[in-house]
Amino acid sequence: MSRKQLALFEPVLLVQALTDAVKKLSPRAQWRNPVMFVVWAGSVLATLLTLAMVTGQIAGSALFTGVISLWLWFTVLFANFAEALAEGRSKAQANSLKGVKKTAFARRLRAPRHDAQADNVPAAELRKGDIVLVKAGDIIPCDGEVIEGGASVDESAITGESAPVIRESGGDFASVTGGRAVEAAGDVDVLLLDKTGTITLGNRQASDFIPARGVDERTLADAAQLASLADETPEGRSIVILAKQRFNLRERDVQSLHATFVPFTAQSRMSGINIDNRMIRKGSVDAIRRHVESNGGHFPADVEQNVENVARLGATPLVVVEGARVLGVIALKDIVKGGIKERFAQLRKMGIKTVMITGDNRLTAAAIAAEAGVDDFLAEATPEAKLALIRQYQAEGRLVAMTGDGTNDAPALAQADVAVAMNSGTQAAKEAGNMVDLDSNPTKLIEVVHIGKQMLMTRGSLTTFSIANDVAKYFAIIPAAFAATYPQLNALNVMGLHSPNSAILSAVIFNALIIIFLIPLALKGVSYKPLSASAMLRRNLWIYGLGGLVVPFIGIKVIDVLLTLLDLA
């Protein structure tokens, strides 16, 4: 199902919003908004006064009072319309999905087997516990859990993302789990970004074997391949493939070798294999050094130099060891994403500090950080180091945002002010974060910050305009309205409004019309450009502060001239 993009003023939504705006004129609906309730009460009072003047019960200009009451009602109606239109736009997508459910049919299985007999039933009749079979080209009939199989699913109607995503057994997804998460993102001034997949393409590949002195390259490649046989990461598979390409070392099966695979952990930071009496490990430099020294060995100086050379080129060095003997270095090469440096420059203009988080050593991290243009980096990062770094920034009064996908990221995600967990990550990470990226794209954190900034800018701009607008309105109408009582105020009547009645009526009409003109701005949002806080403040004050002062003077004067020409005041 494709996602229908809503126009700013969809005809169907406009009609519904007008209907809802009239319904909201009831006292019960108005009571929920104290400010508009005061205007509503004034409208009722002005209407009663108009009726009293028409019937001759009290003296006064029924025309003037009637026009005032009419525009007060318009003010309430326009405010209701703006609220109803915003609500209608947010509900439109959900209603379209409900419409799909009413017309969609599902294959409900009679038994929990994919080959069981199925009944075609309307999606609306599905209940909790039903098992549904979905085939290629089908609409997903309802929300549920995938218990068997997998598929590429178009979720654009829900997420707005056009690219299909993989949904399979054991997967799950959520969206924003913390209500103020996006708003908080607008105040973020430190971004912690994982190197792999965010700053780099995330497909590190083994590019070279660099043996230690006295070790031939084939011996190193053989040991590296054995240590990677059960390693299902892209890096591990690339090591196996490189050894096969270079030395025709065929891939072997761990079980047939009667070997024990030692998986990677965030604490050990190495993996490997135990086979016969051989104990082979590959991992980060510091982890292998500790391993060698704990087994009574010595870390060779030539390997240290090779590690440094690999790191200076921006590649990641992995060291291979058998027992306490260091065999050499594997170089893993990744590529920095195109355009990422420019994006970091924009964030810097906004006053946001970017910090790259990586398990690489300091030399590799420094090389990639310089290439990518980040402000700082945390090398050889452990879960404890990430958590400590976040707490350090928060102690300095900063708001921190980060991404993560693993169980070891959960403590840091829980500590961060804005935490975006990857949908492809573990359940612990998703529960710790206050947002989940359905597309598992860590770069989305930058987009979240942009959206948060735009929300804050829109709110601030409208508030600035509103305050300046009110100041200008009162400065414009008070001298004219009270000049007869206090002649000294004529000196402040710089606009030369025709009469006190004209001044009041012009202000009331302008107040109603400005609501309509501000609706597109409120719905679409203020256009956002990466600027520093001071530059952004100056820009808003010039556009919305000065604009809020100038627009009422011009608008009220134009309305005053029209009222005078029409002899309505």
From Swiss-Prot:
Keyword Mitochondrion: no
A family per Pfam: E1-E2_ATPase
Main location (coarse class): membrane
An annotated Gene Ontology molecular function: magnesium ion binding
Gene3D superfamilies: Calcium-transporting ATPase, cytoplasmic domain N, Calcium-transporting ATPase, cytoplasmic transduction domain A, Calcium-transporting ATPase, transmembrane domain, HAD superfamily/HAD-like
Residues annotated to bind Mg(2+): 405, 409
Transmembrane segments: 34-54, 58-78, 475-495, 503-523, 543-563
EC supergroup of this enzyme: translocase
Membrane topology, record value: Multi-pass membrane protein
Residues forming the catalytic site: 194
Catalytic activity, EC: 7.2.2.6
Superkingdom field: Bacteria
PROSITE patterns: ATPASE_E1_E2 (PS00154)
Binding-site residues, ATP: 231, 235, 264-271, 282
GO CC annotation: plasma membrane
Keyword 4Fe-4S part of the UniProt annotation: no
Keyword annotations of the record: ATP-binding, Cell inner membrane, Cell membrane, Ion transport, Magnesium, Membrane, Metal-binding, Nucleotide-binding, Phosphoprotein, Potassium, Potassium transport, Translocase, Transmembrane, Transmembrane helix, Transport
Subcellular compartments: Cell inner membrane
Catalytic activity, reaction form: K(+)(out) + ATP + H2O = K(+)(in) + ADP + phosphate + H(+)
Function statement: Part of the high-affinity ATP-driven potassium transport (or Kdp) system, which catalyzes the hydrolysis of ATP coupled with the electrogenic transport of potassium into the cytoplasm. This subunit is responsible for energy coupling to the transport system and for the release of the potassium ions to the cytoplasm.
Protein family: Belongs to the cation transport ATPase (P-type) (TC 3.A.3) family. Type IA subfamily.
Quaternary structure, from the entry: The system is composed of three essential subunits: KdpA, KdpB and KdpC.
UniProt-recorded name of the protein: Putative potassium-transporting ATPase ATP-binding subunit
Top-level taxonomy: Bacteria, Pseudomonadati, Pseudomonadota, Gammaproteobacteria, Enterobacterales
Gene name tied to this protein: kdpB
